UniProtKB/Swiss-Prot annotation:
PROSITE patterns reported in the protein's UniProt record: RIBOSOMAL_L23
Coiled coil: none
Stated family: Belongs to the universal ribosomal protein uL23 family.
One of the GO biological process terms: translation
Pfam families reported in the protein's UniProt record: Ribosomal_L23
Principal location class: plastid
Subunit structure, as described in the record: Part of the 50S ribosomal subunit.
The protein, known as: Large ribosomal subunit protein uL23cz/uL23cy
InterPro entries for this protein: Nucleotide-bd_a/b_plait_sf (IPR012677), Ribosomal_uL23-like (IPR013025), Ribosomal_uL23/eL15/eS24_sf (IPR012678), Ribosomal_uL23_CS (IPR001014)
Claim: Glycoprotein is one of the keywords in the record: no
Organism: Saccharum officinarum (Sugarcane)
GO (cellular component) term, any one: ribosome
Amino acid sequence: MDGIKYAVFTEKSLRLLGKNQYTFNVESGFTKTEIKHWVELFFGVKVVAVNSHRLPGKGRRMGPILGHTMHYRRMIITLQPGYSIPLLDRETN
């Protein structure tokens, strides 16, 4: 699971959980096929679709030196109905 950094919990990603879609930030060098294979292998689920977009890095300043953080990719993974990732499911009471 070297390619997947962490799960994302924003307003949009929490809304997508209801549609059985999970959001992850991943290393920018990996393909959709590799991420799909890793998610299916690690979580034991069936992936239907993988959508991605690249987010830009942010500018950083340390005194007079300008720099920036690295860009990364965000993957939205749609699972087949009946499957879920239990660690990321939100409890609804």
